[in-house]
Amino acid sequence: VIGLIAGLGLAVASKVMAVPVDEKAEEIQAALPGANCGACGFSGCSGYAAALSQGKTTDTGRCMPGGAEVSKAIAKITGLAAGDVVPMTAVVLCQGNMHNTDTKLNYVGVKSCKMATQLFGGPKECVYGCIGFGDCVEVCPYDAIHICEGVARINPLACHACKMCVNTCPKGIIDLMPLHEAKAAVMCKNHDKGAQTRKECKAGCIGCMKCVKTCEYGAVTVLSLIHISEPTR
Protein backbone atom coordinates (compact mmCIF):
# COMPACT_ATOMS: atom_id res chain seq x y z
CA VAL A 1 0.00 0.00 0.00
CA ILE A 2 2.80 2.40 0.94
CA GLY A 3 4.54 1.60 -2.35
CA LEU A 4 1.35 2.30 -4.30
CA ILE A 5 0.81 5.65 -2.56
CA ALA A 6 4.44 6.62 -3.13
CA GLY A 7 4.18 5.66 -6.78
CA LEU A 8 1.03 7.75 -7.25
CA GLY A 9 2.71 10.66 -5.48
CA LEU A 10 5.69 10.52 -7.81
CA ALA A 11 3.43 10.30 -10.84
CA VAL A 12 1.49 13.39 -9.77
CA ALA A 13 4.70 15.26 -8.94
CA SER A 14 6.18 14.47 -12.36
CA LYS A 15 3.12 16.00 -14.01
CA VAL A 16 2.95 19.08 -11.78
CA MET A 17 6.68 19.81 -11.88
CA ALA A 18 7.22 18.91 -15.51
CA VAL A 19 9.18 21.47 -17.54
CA PRO A 20 7.50 22.29 -20.88
CA VAL A 21 9.56 21.12 -23.85
CA ASP A 22 10.36 23.78 -26.42
CA GLU A 23 10.11 21.68 -29.56
CA LYS A 24 11.18 24.51 -31.86
CA ALA A 25 14.31 25.11 -29.77
CA GLU A 26 15.13 21.41 -29.92
CA GLU A 27 14.71 21.41 -33.70
CA ILE A 28 16.97 24.45 -34.03
CA GLN A 29 19.57 22.90 -31.76
CA ALA A 30 19.56 19.76 -33.88
CA ALA A 31 20.43 21.91 -36.90
CA LEU A 32 23.41 23.49 -35.12
CA PRO A 33 26.86 21.83 -35.28
CA GLY A 34 27.05 21.25 -31.51
CA ALA A 35 30.43 22.94 -31.01
CA ASN A 36 29.10 24.88 -27.98
CA CYS A 37 31.84 27.42 -28.63
CA GLY A 38 29.88 30.53 -27.68
CA ALA A 39 30.97 32.42 -30.81
CA CYS A 40 27.31 33.31 -31.34
CA GLY A 41 27.32 35.36 -28.15
CA PHE A 42 25.19 32.90 -26.18
CA SER A 43 26.14 30.18 -23.69
CA GLY A 44 26.26 27.54 -26.39
CA CYS A 45 24.14 25.85 -29.03
CA SER A 46 21.23 25.33 -26.64
CA GLY A 47 21.36 28.96 -25.52
CA TYR A 48 21.33 30.22 -29.10
CA ALA A 49 18.51 27.84 -30.05
CA ALA A 50 16.41 28.98 -27.08
CA ALA A 51 17.02 32.64 -27.90
CA LEU A 52 15.86 32.14 -31.48
CA SER A 53 12.83 30.15 -30.41
CA GLN A 54 11.81 32.73 -27.80
CA GLY A 55 12.36 35.70 -30.09
CA LYS A 56 15.28 37.10 -28.08
CA THR A 57 17.23 37.28 -31.34
CA THR A 58 16.22 37.13 -34.98
CA ASP A 59 19.76 36.80 -36.31
CA THR A 60 20.04 33.37 -37.90
CA GLY A 61 23.61 33.98 -39.02
CA ARG A 62 25.40 33.96 -35.68
CA CYS A 63 26.74 30.42 -35.92
CA MET A 64 30.24 30.82 -37.35
CA PRO A 65 31.10 27.09 -37.45
CA GLY A 66 27.82 26.31 -39.21
CA GLY A 67 28.11 29.06 -41.77
CA ALA A 68 25.53 29.85 -44.44
CA GLU A 69 24.19 26.28 -44.54
CA VAL A 70 23.14 26.34 -40.88
CA SER A 71 21.77 29.86 -41.25
CA LYS A 72 19.47 28.67 -44.03
CA ALA A 73 18.39 25.64 -41.98
CA ILE A 74 17.51 27.84 -39.00
CA ALA A 75 15.64 30.26 -41.25
CA LYS A 76 13.57 27.38 -42.60
CA ILE A 77 12.65 26.23 -39.09
CA THR A 78 11.88 29.66 -37.65
CA GLY A 79 10.48 31.42 -40.69
CA LEU A 80 13.05 34.17 -40.25
CA ALA A 81 15.27 35.53 -43.00
CA ALA A 82 18.57 33.73 -43.49
CA GLY A 83 21.29 35.96 -42.06
CA ASP A 84 24.46 36.86 -43.89
CA VAL A 85 27.43 34.87 -42.64
CA VAL A 86 30.81 36.44 -43.34
CA PRO A 87 33.49 33.71 -43.54
CA MET A 88 35.78 34.19 -40.55
CA THR A 89 39.09 32.73 -39.47
CA ALA A 90 41.31 32.89 -36.42
CA VAL A 91 44.80 34.33 -36.94
CA VAL A 92 47.84 34.04 -34.68
CA LEU A 93 49.36 37.53 -34.70
CA CYS A 94 52.97 36.53 -34.16
CA GLN A 95 56.02 35.76 -36.30
CA GLY A 96 58.32 34.92 -33.42
CA ASN A 97 59.41 31.52 -34.67
CA MET A 98 62.72 29.84 -33.84
CA HIS A 99 64.50 31.88 -36.52
CA ASN A 100 63.24 35.26 -35.38
CA THR A 101 63.42 35.16 -31.60
CA ASP A 102 65.67 33.48 -29.03
CA THR A 103 64.87 31.76 -25.76
CA LYS A 104 65.80 33.46 -22.51
CA LEU A 105 65.47 30.41 -20.27
CA ASN A 106 65.43 26.63 -20.46
CA TYR A 107 61.86 25.72 -19.58
CA VAL A 108 61.49 22.15 -18.30
CA GLY A 109 57.98 22.30 -16.85
CA VAL A 110 54.63 21.14 -18.20
CA LYS A 111 54.32 21.85 -21.93
CA SER A 112 51.46 24.27 -21.49
CA CYS A 113 51.36 27.86 -22.71
CA LYS A 114 49.25 28.85 -19.72
CA MET A 115 51.70 27.31 -17.25
CA ALA A 116 54.80 28.63 -19.01
CA THR A 117 53.41 32.18 -19.14
CA GLN A 118 53.42 32.29 -15.34
CA LEU A 119 57.21 31.90 -15.33
CA PHE A 120 58.67 35.25 -16.44
CA GLY A 121 56.15 35.48 -19.27
CA GLY A 122 57.40 32.33 -20.98
CA PRO A 123 60.72 30.99 -22.30
CA LYS A 124 61.04 33.29 -25.33
CA GLU A 125 62.68 36.72 -25.36
CA CYS A 126 59.43 38.33 -26.48
CA VAL A 127 56.91 38.11 -23.66
CA TYR A 128 54.05 39.06 -25.98
CA GLY A 129 54.53 36.33 -28.59
CA CYS A 130 53.39 32.77 -29.15
CA ILE A 131 54.98 30.30 -26.74
CA GLY A 132 54.33 27.43 -29.11
CA PHE A 133 53.37 24.69 -26.66
CA GLY A 134 50.03 24.16 -28.36
CA ASP A 135 47.24 24.93 -25.89
CA CYS A 136 45.29 26.18 -28.91
CA VAL A 137 46.06 22.99 -30.82
CA GLU A 138 44.59 20.90 -28.01
CA VAL A 139 41.26 22.75 -27.91
CA CYS A 140 40.70 23.04 -31.67
CA PRO A 141 37.95 20.56 -32.63
CA TYR A 142 38.70 20.89 -36.35
CA ASP A 143 42.45 20.10 -36.49
CA ALA A 144 43.00 23.55 -37.99
CA ILE A 145 46.01 24.53 -35.85
CA HIS A 146 49.55 23.19 -35.94
CA ILE A 147 52.85 24.32 -34.45
CA CYS A 148 55.27 25.39 -37.18
CA GLU A 149 58.83 26.28 -36.15
CA GLY A 150 57.70 27.15 -32.65
CA VAL A 151 54.64 29.24 -33.52
CA ALA A 152 51.00 28.21 -33.85
CA ARG A 153 49.64 28.53 -37.37
CA ILE A 154 45.99 28.26 -38.36
CA ASN A 155 44.72 26.85 -41.65
CA PRO A 156 41.98 29.33 -42.66
CA LEU A 157 40.32 26.73 -44.87
CA ALA A 158 39.93 24.34 -41.92
CA CYS A 159 39.08 26.99 -39.30
CA HIS A 160 35.39 27.21 -38.34
CA ALA A 161 35.79 30.43 -36.33
CA CYS A 162 34.57 28.78 -33.13
CA LYS A 163 36.82 31.01 -30.95
CA MET A 164 38.02 28.11 -28.81
CA CYS A 165 41.64 29.04 -29.54
CA VAL A 166 40.96 32.75 -29.06
CA ASN A 167 39.62 32.10 -25.57
CA THR A 168 42.43 29.69 -24.70
CA CYS A 169 45.54 31.66 -25.70
CA PRO A 170 47.07 33.14 -22.52
CA LYS A 171 48.87 35.79 -24.56
CA GLY A 172 45.73 37.05 -26.28
CA ILE A 173 47.43 37.07 -29.67
CA ILE A 174 44.81 35.09 -31.58
CA ASP A 175 42.20 37.28 -33.23
CA LEU A 176 39.07 36.37 -35.14
CA MET A 177 38.66 38.28 -38.38
CA PRO A 178 36.91 38.06 -41.76
CA LEU A 179 38.72 35.62 -44.05
CA HIS A 180 39.27 38.24 -46.74
CA GLU A 181 40.99 40.55 -44.22
CA ALA A 182 43.41 37.99 -42.78
CA LYS A 183 46.12 38.64 -45.39
CA ALA A 184 46.31 42.30 -44.39
CA ALA A 185 46.69 41.66 -40.65
CA VAL A 186 49.72 43.08 -38.84
CA MET A 187 51.37 39.94 -37.48
CA CYS A 188 52.71 41.33 -34.22
CA LYS A 189 51.36 42.37 -30.83
CA ASN A 190 54.54 43.59 -29.17
CA HIS A 191 53.90 46.66 -27.01
CA ASP A 192 57.56 47.60 -26.50
CA LYS A 193 59.35 50.45 -28.21
CA GLY A 194 61.29 49.77 -31.40
CA ALA A 195 64.76 49.41 -29.88
CA GLN A 196 63.56 46.84 -27.36
CA THR A 197 61.48 44.98 -29.94
CA ARG A 198 64.54 44.61 -32.20
CA LYS A 199 66.35 42.85 -29.37
CA GLU A 200 63.44 40.49 -28.79
CA CYS A 201 62.36 39.53 -32.31
CA LYS A 202 63.73 40.04 -35.83
CA ALA A 203 60.21 40.14 -37.27
CA GLY A 204 58.58 42.28 -34.58
CA CYS A 205 56.83 45.55 -35.36
CA ILE A 206 59.16 48.38 -34.26
CA GLY A 207 56.66 51.19 -34.74
CA CYS A 208 58.74 52.93 -37.42
CA MET A 209 55.52 54.31 -38.94
CA LYS A 210 56.64 53.56 -42.52
CA CYS A 211 53.48 51.61 -43.26
CA VAL A 212 51.36 54.44 -41.86
CA LYS A 213 53.12 57.04 -44.00
CA THR A 214 53.16 55.04 -47.23
CA CYS A 215 49.56 53.78 -47.12
CA GLU A 216 47.64 56.19 -49.35
CA TYR A 217 44.30 54.99 -48.02
CA GLY A 218 44.93 55.71 -44.35
CA ALA A 219 44.27 52.06 -43.54
CA VAL A 220 47.06 51.71 -40.96
CA THR A 221 47.10 53.31 -37.53
CA VAL A 222 49.12 52.85 -34.36
CA LEU A 223 47.41 52.11 -31.06
CA SER A 224 49.56 51.66 -27.96
CA LEU A 225 52.63 50.95 -30.13
CA ILE A 226 50.70 48.28 -32.06
CA HIS A 227 50.04 48.80 -35.76
CA ILE A 228 46.43 48.14 -36.72
CA SER A 229 45.42 47.67 -40.34
CA GLU A 230 41.93 48.24 -41.71
CA PRO A 231 41.68 45.91 -44.74
CA THR A 232 38.34 47.38 -45.85
CA ARG A 233 40.24 50.53 -46.84
What are these regions (language model features)?
Residues V1-T214, T221:
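Ferredoxin-type iron-sulfur electron-transfer modules and their immediate structural context
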Residues I226-T232:
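Residue-level detector of conserved catalytic or cofactor/ligand-binding positions
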